[in-house]
A protein has these predicted regions:
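Surface-exposed binding/hinge segments that line
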Residues: 1-29
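Alpha-helical secondary-structure segments
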Residues: 3-9, 44-45, 72-75, 92-93, ...
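Gly/Pro-rich hinge or "lid" segments in bacterial periplasmic/extracellular proteins
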Residues: 20-71, 75-77, 83, 196
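Ligand-site clamp/hinge motif
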Residues: 64-109, 228, 236
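Short, hydrophobic alpha-helical packing/hinge segments within bilobed ligand-binding/sensory domains
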Residues: 87-88, 96, 106-107, 143, ...
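Ligand-binding "clamshell"
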Residues: 108-120, 253-257, 268-269
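Structural transition elements
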Residues: 166-200, 216-219
Length: 269
């Protein structure tokens, strides 16, 4: 309106509106971006100065930021380093100030480093093995159920993720969401049930699972553990480690069965 306030008119009630307004997909553009698609005013503490997809992005302080309690450095540079060893080396040498996606098996080591502070937080994201349900052999529900019962989630959480997380249950809503379901029984590792569904599926031969450390920290080891637990059900999983570089372009959402990661959203809707 004329007073400088943003007015949102809804066609129906939406209790999640305040949270939806905080989603990073929501942007404000002059005339809705119809005049110039890449035009934006921006309300954050930094302005984008350069961007190379899959390489780096640089930012400079926004002198017109409407808040004075943030943006305390003059510039920020985000560098893409898919290789875990390279990220840790960059942090340890002082080349970078922060890294994310630390492998659980290296957390204890980093905690002993005098110049490193390890920060933990619970989140809404999750690690998973995704399959194209419209592509064979994964278009067979019995095969999908066989794989779900053939994965030892607790073993992956304990042995691969170092206990940093909670068990997933084949849907994307965890306890960090306000409306997380509490009445759905946890699906547990059950090689007998897995074998039963696998037999019903009529499938034979190995199943190719593609993975990479780019998917999530420990993704390669998790895939190998999945392979081992599935053997007890008579299911042969072939694990193929893909290069970290190019994984999100060449493998994820391209190949039918892959390791992946999904970030959280403001609400479960």
């Amino acid at each position: 309106d004329q007073g400088g306030d943003l007015v949102v008119t809804l066609t129906e009630g939406n209790a999640d509106l305040p949270l939806i307004l905080s989603d990073y997909h929501l942007i404000v553009q002059p005339n809705g971006g119809f005049d110039k698609l890449d035009a934006a005013i921006g309300t954050g503490p930094y302005k984008l100065t350069s961007y190379q997809a899959g390489v780096r992005a640089t930012f400079e302080k926004n002198a017109d930021d409407w808040r004075d309690d943030r943006g305390f450095v003059d510039s920020v540079e985000l560098i893409v380093m898919n290789d875990t060893t390279a990220r840790i080396a960059a942090l340890s040498s002082g080349q970078v100030h922060f890294i994310n996606a630390v492998e659980p098996k290296t957390v204890r080591l980093l905690e002993r480093a005098p110049i490193v502070n390890v920060l933990r937080s619970s989140g809404k994201g999750f690690c998973w093995f995704l399959a194209f349900c419209d592509t064979g052999p994964f278009d067979n529900n019995d095969l999908r159920l066989a794989l779900k019962y053939a994965v030892d989630r607790q073993a992956i959480l304990d042995r691969i993720l170092g206990g940093f997380g909670t068990l997933g249950n084949d849907y994307p809503i965890n306890a960090n969401y306000a409306l997380a379901p509490e009445d759905i029984e946890q699906r547990a590792y059950d090689p007998e049930k897995a074998a039963e569904h696998y037999k019903k599926s009529g499938h034979s031969g190995s199943i190719l699972l593609r993975t990479s450390e780019a998917a999530f920290p420990g993704a390669v080891d998790a895939a190998v553990l999945f392979q081992e637990s599935a053997k007890a059900a008579g299911i042969a999983i072939e694990v193929k480690r893909e290069p970290d570089d190019g994984y999100w372009t060449n493998v994820w959402n391209v190949q039918p069965f892959v390791a992946s990661y999904w970030g959280g959203r403001p609400t479960q809707d």
